[in-house]
């Protein structure tokens, strides 16, 4: 019997969270021991559930700010919902081989399986955090509509949301890595290396997979013809455009 309510098992059952929400809570609050890290299959399930949520929000820009109807904007929202899980998965898969080589050179190969489990669990946290930023993204789009803010600002805003989610996910990663660092201090260097490699690959991958938001002056497409360019040069140019427009 529940000592607080006195209603027995029925009250306990009514208050019991669903299995999926228990997993979400597990990702965000646990992770101090290796046994607390999620299986890879559950991580990818979370990625496929929460990634499209934020992707659809990103793709709603022209529906809220522009003059496009829901019918016209649904394809972009659908494309973005598909591409956010693609972005996170491709970035993970591209970054892992070099991370494996460096771990081997550092004498940490025996712990590599545990390292990957920690990384993919943090990836699940990143996806959940992104989905939690959906209300802020929608609210910002509404504000952009009233303030006549440029499309470039919307792109930079979403980049900032991904940055915020990534920083938060790295906090989770540090927590997941705690037992490994206690075992071998070289893992601390590996965490820092992973953060750098993941961010470097992720920025370029996101640029290749664009558009996620959809320019109001261009037709809706899954990819752009000029996708394979240097992301860092283009981001710098976009940042300068925003500064000069203020």
What does each model-found stretch correspond to?
Residues 2-17, 36-54, 84-89, 118-130:
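Alpha-helical transmembrane segments of integral membrane proteins, especially early/N-terminal helices
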Residues 5-31, 59-65, 169-180, 209:
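Juxtamembrane interface elements at the cytosolic ends of transmembrane helices
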Residues 56-70, 134-139, 209-218:
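Membrane-helix interface motif
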Residues 82-86, 100-214:
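Hydrophobic alpha-helical transmembrane segments and adjacent short intramembrane/lumenal linkers
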Residues 193-194, 198-246:
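Long, intrinsically disordered, low-complexity regulatory segments adjacent to structured domains
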Residues 1-44, 230-246:
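N-terminal juxtamembrane cytosolic/stromal segments of multi-pass membrane proteins
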Residues 40-115:
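A glycine-rich, hydrophobic loop/mini-helix early in the fold
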């Amino acid at each position: 019997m529940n000592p607080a309510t006195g209603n027995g098992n029925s009250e306990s059952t009514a208050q019991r969270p669903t299995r999926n929400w228990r997993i979400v809570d597990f990702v965000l609050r646990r992770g101090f021991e290796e046994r607390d890290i999620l299986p890879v299959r559950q991580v990818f399930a979370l990625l496929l559930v929460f990634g499209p949520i934020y992707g659809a929000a990103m793709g709603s820009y022209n529906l809220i700010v522009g003059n496009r109807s829901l019918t016209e904007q649904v394809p972009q929202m659908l494309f973005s919902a598909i591409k956010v899980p693609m972005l996170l998965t491709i970035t993970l898969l591209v970054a892992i081989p070099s991370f494996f080589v460096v771990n081997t050179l550092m004498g940490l190969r025996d712990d590599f399986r545990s390292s990957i489990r920690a990384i993919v669990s943090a990836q699940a946290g990143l996806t959940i955090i992104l989905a939690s930023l959906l209300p802020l993204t929608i609210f910002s789009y509404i504000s952009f509509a009233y303030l006549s803010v440029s499309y470039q600002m919307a792109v930079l805003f979403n980049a900032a949301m991904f940055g915020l989610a990534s920083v938060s996910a790295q906090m989770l990663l540090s927590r997941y890595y705690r037992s490994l660092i206690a075992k071998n201090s070289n893992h601390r260097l590996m965490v820092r290396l992973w953060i750098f490699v993941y961010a470097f690959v992720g920025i370029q991958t996101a640029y290749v997979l664009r558009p996620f938001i959809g320019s109001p002056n261009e037709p809706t497409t899954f990819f752009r013809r000029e996708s394979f360019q240097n992301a860092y040069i283009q981001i710098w140019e976009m940042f300068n455009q925003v500064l000069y427009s203020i």
